[in-house]
Regions:
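Amphipathic alpha-helical dimerization/coiled-coil segments
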Residues: 2-7, 76-107
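N-terminal helix-turn-helix DNA-binding core of bacterial DNA-binding proteins
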Residues: 6-47, 66-79
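Alpha-helical residues within the helix-turn-helix
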Residues: 39, 56-57
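Residues within the DNA-recognition helix of helix-turn-helix
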Residues: 51
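Mid-chain, well-packed structural core segment of small domains
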Residues: 57-58, 66
């Protein structure tokens, strides 16, 4: 159970930063070289590396080294897993819906 929460935290962390959300938006149109991401985002190399590590560790993004640059793209399996984890967290079972009565003895 603990490892599932660790996975969720790792995946959800990928979505908790404006720069990472911008990177994900850029990658929706296809693979991008790190040089293009640097140009689009107007951030430094070390900042981009930090964000790409978090995105790759989450499984949502994958990198492919070509020469001195890394090319990044969305990982279909990783994005499907992120969607599954989010749906799992937000889903209420029918029992949970029925149990949602007044809180703390209130009416």
């Amino acid at each position: 159970m603990g490892s599932e929460y660790a996975e969720m935290a790792r995946v959800f962390k990928a979505f908790c930063d404006e720069n990472r959300l911008q990177i994900l938006a850029l990658l929706r149109s296809g693979e991008k070289c790190a040089c293009k991401l640097l140009e689009e985002l107007q951030i430094g190399q070390s900042t981009l590396s930090h964000h790409m590590k978090i995105l790759c560790d989450s499984g949502v993004v994958r990198g492919r080294k070509e020469g001195k640059w890394v090319h990044y793209s969305l990982d279909p399996a990783g994005t499907a897993r992120a969607r599954q984890l989010l749906e799992q967290q937000l889903a209420l079972s029918s029992n949970e819906v029925q149990d949602m009565g007044p809180c703390c003895g209130g009416k």
